Amino acid sequence: VGFIDLATKYNLYVTVKPGPYVMAETTDQGIPRWLTLTYPETLARDDRGQMWGPEFVGLNNSIFKEKAARWLDLFAKKVVVPRQNLKQGAVIMMQICNEIGIFQWLGAKGDYSASNLKAWQEYLQKAFPELAQLARLLDRELKSYEEVAPPSEFCETRRQFVLYRLWHDFHRQVYADYVGFITDILRKAGVKTPLFTNNCGWVYGRAHEFALNGTFHRKTDKAQPDLLFGLDHIPEIVSPNNTHDGFVANQVARELQHRTGPLYSAELQCGSREHGVQPYPNELGLFYRHCIIHGLTGMNFYMFAQGKNPKGRGVDGPMFYWYNAVNYKAEHQPAFPMIQTLGQWLKFNGSFLTEAQRPAHLGVGFYPHLYETEFLVPILGKGTKLNPSKLGLNLDPVGFRDRAYFDGVIRILMKKSVPFDLADLTTRSLRELLSYQTLVVLSNEMMDAKTQAHLAEFVRAGGKLVIFPTLPTYDLDFNPCTILADSLGIKTTGRGASNRIYMDNLKDIPVPQLPQIISHRGAKVIARDADGQVAGVEKKIGKGSVRFFGFFVNYSIEEHPDLWSAMMQLPGIPRNAVADNDDLSIEARYVNNEGLLFAGNFHRMPMRSNLSVKNPRGKEMIRVGLVELPAQTGLMLPIQKQVSGDTTIVFAHAELMKVQSDAKGLHLGLQGIEGMKGQLVLKTRRPIREVKVDAAAVPFTKEGDTWRISYQQNGRVQTVSVT
């Protein structure tokens, strides 16, 4: 409370995280030790009855919920409600617990405590009102629901797989009920501020597991439509290998919120919890800008300031975080100037960003059920319980989604700066899917009947579907289900003997598995293997079309991006910005006839590209010209920015920090990169007589109805005065 009042004194907005779990590297995760010592029945337990640890509680335990309710009610009434309507220093948001489901994910185990097993039985009864339904599904005789114990063994039979599916689904219901429990307490206590929870999933600088964590709230988002799903961004080491990871995290949270409300990073890396794992200012500034151009509109640094823990309170010792913007003595550290600059830029451009859109004509299907594997395949795959071959599956779901989906399709699209959205196939309407010029779906052998029918209808209604490497043959309960294949009229006849693909001008391209051989009756052949067997077809279905390939591609050789491009016909997908090579990552956002162009260099050496960007005020692309960026730097360039009644910045090779005008003329604050040649192109009806940069005259030329100004940039905010 003292901290909140101090923030109020200095007119700083406050978000609060009262728990029950607060984590933040505190001892016992913020759960009071007296709770589990006095009431051991509150502890979460594994399948052998052993407690997970003294700080891990069962979310369904009535005693835990009673104590948590009293605490949250008290905190809400005493701290939040009196401060939520203040004119300055208000509490503006409140976090619901912290990274719900993280301990189940990290431990690869569900909660087998008595309270949770009771909830499990209730879940089964609600899901299967007739016991016979459940018995048929599990292919066994049942006399009561109590006979169905949660799974813990290796998954080698289809019955075991179905039981694990139910166990995963049950925990998602637990998380939804838990969020609802906390939300009800806070709202009844009078809290009116927005509520949010946060999703984790970055491991060693990769976000492969973020989508899995996002599925924890597959049921929460339906029960709590106003809840914000904050996301954690912990890239650690920024490089071309994880350029796409932040985008995926943004998109998963965006889909959970059904593309409404602000996209908010509740934990945006600024510093490191591990001494020796040092993020550097330039790479973080690049990462922040990349996340912003891809939709991030709310940022909470974790952590902006270093802290010193009271004795015994820090699980990692006396110091809390390293390499922050300021240390625990409030002294500026190397990251401070970068964040200060970004803050100044956001202050000027923030209103644009909250309204701007990133047009996308390509959708990439996101199928959440593919990610519901946390109890079968532990993080990093250590000690997996899943044996796909014994289940009759050709594709390991985790390896498939990581290699083909995440580091295959998504990485290639990001590398080529193709604007696209992740589209949740289980929640997007037919109309929403049809808004995309092309929908790309990576499918394994399992997909529920409703989604299969949805995709079939998408094609018949005029959609263009690109799908690979197989068509589903089972539903999620391992019942035969070929609705999509039957609707598309596509049949496969086994696997070929060569893994080399020939398509268009691409020859002898290796793929990870032997491709499926496809019957091409009534279809156009578009890909073959080295033996001439058909591995890809295209055909018309109703008003739409489908391209099916019996293979997928990794990204390990130079030709793989070109093969992906040919499969998805990427040259025909409209771009918001284009470059003459893939060395820079580029993207743009637009609103009210104005735009913002991001150019970023994720490499560890200088890179250059000739850039053009879609003109928000006309059909012709705007030629931005050659942009060369030092290693791991990025810029947000203004496009068609109205800066006065009769003057527009067509483009600049610097970030626009401020605009002022007086009797002497127009004054633009521009900040570029030290040593980079400055280019500013203005369009104005008035003749320009003189241009000065920081009071020194610089050359300019008239080109048609525009004026081009050239100068040298010094890495600081430079005032360009135009009279």
Question: What are the roles of these predicted feature ranges?
Answer:
Residues V1, V22-R33, C200-E209, V418-Y436, ...:
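Aromatic-lined carbohydrate-binding/catalytic grooves of carbohydrate-active enzymes
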Residues V1-Y39, T183, R187, M446:
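Aromatic-lined substrate-binding rim segments of carbohydrate-active enzymes
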Residues V14-P18, I92-I96, L195-T197, F229-L231, ...:
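Hydrophobic faces of well-ordered beta-strands that scaffold small-molecule active sites
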Residues G19-M23, I96-G101, C200-G205, I234-E236, ...:
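Active-site beta-loop-alpha junctions enriched in small/polar residues
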Residues T36-K219, T426:
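Polysaccharide-binding and catalytic clefts of secreted carbohydrate-active enzymes
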Residues A68-A69, A76, G89-I92, Y145, ...:
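Carbohydrate-binding surfaces of carbohydrate-active enzymes
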Residues I185, A189-D245, H275-Y288:
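Extracellular glycoside hydrolase catalytic/binding regions
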Residues I673-G675, V681-T723:
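Beta-strand-rich ligand-recognition modules
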